Amino acid sequence: MANEKQYPMTKEGKEKLEQELEYLKTVKRKEVVERIKIARGFGDLSENSEYDAAKDEQAFVESRIQMLENMIRNAVIIEEDKENPDVVSLGKSVTFIELPDGEEETYTIVGSAEADPFEGKISNDSPIAKSLLGRRVGDEVTVQTPGGEMLVKIVAVK
């Protein structure tokens, strides 16, 4: 158990996972069990697509519960780095411009457990985050992306 993977995350990220876990345990799990009961009432289980779908969903829910419990148990809360406010670090938002065109992008660098690119939260394991971590406002950085290299200039860290 001592070698379990640790999951760096913000306090808010951990709270979000705890809320999802609570929902799965108190609401979703019961809904799925009820769907299984109803599907069993349809008779022969060998050709019962409703039963198969409900059992598949039950397996997914139970797997997600186990995964969330593990991530929460092994969460490492990211503390704000007040001593280096202009240095890119885990839990901070970084704004950069792509050079030479000047397109601006902002991301918050978080642990993989709470990464959500659609919300502007990228994993510290992503190529962009790896290139930016430890850098300062004003630094120009070459970032490796699936589409190739891009040069960026860090303009803000919050």
Curated annotation (Swiss-Prot):
One of its GO terms (biological process) is regulation of DNA-templated transcription elongation. It comes from the Bacteria. GO terms for molecular function: DNA binding; RNA polymerase binding. PROSITE patterns: GREAB_1, GREAB_2. Keywords: Coiled coil, DNA-binding, Transcription, Transcription regulation. Residues 10-75 form a coiled coil. The keyword Transcription regulation applies. It holds the Pfam family GreA_GreB_N. NCBIfam families: greA (TIGR01462), PRK00226.1-2 (NF001261), PRK00226.1-4 (NF001263). Necessary for efficient RNA polymerase transcription elongation past template-encoded arresting sites. The arresting sites in DNA have the property of trapping a certain fraction of elongating RNA polymerases that pass through, resulting in locked ternary complexes. Cleavage of the nascent transcript by cleavage factors such as GreA or GreB allows the resumption of elongation from the new 3'terminus. GreA releases sequences of 2 to 3 nucleotides. Belongs to the GreA/GreB family. This is Transcription elongation factor GreA. It comes from Geobacillus kaustophilus (strain HTA426). The gene is greA.
